[in-house]
Amino acid sequence: MPTIQQLIRKPRQPKVKRSKSQHLESCPQKRGVCTRVYTTTPKKPNSAMRKVAKVRLTNGFEVISYIPGESHNLQEHSVVLIRGGRVKDLPGVRYHILRGVLDTQGVKDRKQRRSKYGAKRPK
């Protein structure tokens, strides 16, 4: 515990709040190119093959991002738009790919929560 005299000499420093999605550099989304598209397994109590992609962003960073929804058309060299938001059961995956933007197609036959998956309104 510092004395009052010590606090006068050197006041307390405020804690620095770090962003949870630093590589976006305070932007809402960033564009990038897929360098690898693959599946991976989640942490302990869960079991699945989660679709993820390694993306090289326009600022030079390379991040792992999650591909939401059922089936996708992404492959190497696809241009994608990513947003922040981690996947709780995939360590190291802190970004999501936006569906229905740039080279990513929306989810087919999606009826509810369509805007999150880039699906057009069914006729």
Swiss-Prot record:
Description of how the protein assembles with itself and partners = Part of the 30S ribosomal subunit. Contacts proteins S8 and S17. May interact with IF1 in the 30S initiation complex.
For the keyword Translocase, the answer is: no
Which NCBIfam families does this one have? rpsL_bact (TIGR00981)
A Pfam family that this protein carries is Ribosom_S12_S23
The family this protein is said to belong to = Belongs to the universal ribosomal protein uS12 family.
Comp. bias intervals (Basic residues): 9-21
- Provide one Gene Ontology cellular component: small ribosomal subunit
Q: Which domain of life is it from?
A: Bacteria
> Which cystines does this chain contain?
none
Q: Which residues carry this modification: 3-methylthioaspartic acid?
A: D89
Q: Which SUPFAM superfamilies match?
A: Nucleic acid-binding proteins
Region feature (Disordered): 1-28
List the protein's name: Small ribosomal subunit protein uS12
Q: Name one GO molecular function term.
A: tRNA binding
In its UniProt entry, the species of origin is given as: Dinoroseobacter shibae (strain DSM 16493 / NCIMB 14021 / DFL 12)
Taxonomy of the source species: Bacteria, Pseudomonadati, Pseudomonadota, Alphaproteobacteria, Rhodobacterales
Per UniProt, the keywords (alphabetical) are: Methylation, Ribonucleoprotein, Ribosomal protein, RNA-binding, rRNA-binding, tRNA-binding
- What Gene Ontology biological process does one annotation of this record name? translation
Q: What does this protein do?
A: With S4 and S5 plays an important role in translational accuracy.
Q: Which InterPro entries match?
A: NA-bd_OB-fold (IPR012340), Ribosomal_uS12 (IPR006032), Ribosomal_uS12_bac (IPR005679)
Is Ribosomal protein one of the keywords UniProt gives this record?
Answer: yes
| PANTHER family the record matches | 30S RIBOSOMAL PROTEIN S12 FAMILY MEMBER
